[in-house]
């Protein structure tokens, strides 16, 4: 019966991925090239400002990651509130009907954070460019230093924030013994085991499995095939029938994990944004090494 239920979940997950249709979460340079002239397209470049000034995809706006990553306390970051998010979208000229494509030059690391922000805010059409600027340029994609003239949106986007996609330490602690919850630590193995100490305490949240975010990528910075990514997670018993909690040190790297799980169609992915910067500095929370 268990196997039958899991099989049904997998079928539903695959169906959800297939239903992405004209709006896949991960897009290729060819896909983007065909849509560069569309008025409802907004491209956001999350590379360093200096690199953006040297060249970017035509029409791309630059966004400093810090503008979408708010500091909650020392070393701990949070997502923008709904109001902060609406202001950010208005500044970028993004409405609910805009198709948003994100890219960087870090294997999608920075783009994944903004994907998380927009996904939690409830924007329905957000994608990441596979391979980022490197793959785009390697394939002969158009490149410019011209700054786009994008007016602020006069319409404040009306979205439906997904508040159940973000969790705090108490929420995570209260679910540590639940078999229907899986925790994924996106940090390095040395951080996971406590050898690389970046908080008062080293180690990991009890029960968490270590799948470093870099394992999602191939040598050229593109994402591994979906089948390989799916096997990677299922081998660690991180299956679609569970609520999956993602974390790292500050949830920057874990945003990459959040994106991959969404890409794979996992229906319940929860970002613990406090991550180890919070958990590792609180003596009242349990840990393992």
Language-model features and meaning:
Residues 1-6, 251:
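Bacterial N-terminal signal peptides that target proteins for export
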Residues 70-99, 213-244:
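Helix-loop module immediately N-terminal to the HCX5R catalytic loop
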Residues 21-25, 34, 69-71, 133-206, ...:
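Active-site neighborhoods of enzymes that stabilize oxyanions during catalysis
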Residues 23-49, 59-62:
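Mature N-terminal segment immediately following signal peptide/propeptide cleavage
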Residues 7-17:
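Bacterial N-terminal signal peptides
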Residues 79-171, 175, 196, 253-270, ...:
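Thiolate-centered catalytic microenvironments shared by cysteine-dependent enzyme domains
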Residues 231-289:
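C-terminal soluble interaction/assembly domains
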């Amino acid at each position: 019966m268990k196997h039958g239920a899991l099989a049904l979940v997998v079928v539903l997950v695959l169906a959800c991925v297939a239903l992405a249709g004209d709006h896949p979460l991960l897009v290729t340079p060819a896909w983007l090239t065909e849509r560069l002239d569309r008025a409802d397209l907004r491209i956001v470049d999350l590379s360093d400002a200096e690199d953006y000034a040297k060249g970017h995809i035509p029409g791309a706006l630059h966004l400093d990651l810090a503008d979408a990553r708010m500091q909650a306390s020392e070393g701990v970051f949070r997502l923008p509130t709904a109001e902060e998010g609406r202001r950010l979208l208005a500044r970028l000229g993004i409405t609910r009907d805009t198709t948003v494509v994100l890219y960087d030059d870090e294997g999608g690391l920075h783009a994944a954070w903004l994907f998380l922000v927009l996904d939690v805010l409830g924007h329905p059409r957000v994608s990441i460019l596979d391979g980022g600027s490197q793959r785009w340029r390697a394939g002969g994609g158009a490149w410019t230093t011209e700054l786009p003239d994008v007016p602020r949106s006069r319409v404040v986007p009306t979205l439906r924030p997904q508040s159940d996609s973000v969790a705090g330490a108490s929420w995570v602690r209260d679910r540590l013994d639940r078999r229907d919850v899986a925790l994924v630590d996106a940090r390095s193995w040395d951080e996971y085991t406590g050898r690389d100490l970046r908080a008062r305490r080293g180690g990991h949240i009890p029960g968490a499995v270590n799948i470093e975010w870099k394992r999602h990528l191939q040598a050229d910075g593109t994402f591994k095939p979906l089948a390989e990514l799916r096997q990677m997670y299922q081998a660690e018993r991180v299956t679609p029938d569970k609520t999956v909690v993602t974390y790292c040190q500050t949830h920057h790297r874990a945003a990459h994990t959040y994106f991959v799980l969404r890409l794979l169609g996992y229906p319940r992915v929860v970002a613990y944004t406090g991550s180890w910067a919070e958990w590792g500095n609180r003596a009242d929370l349990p840990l393992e090494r």
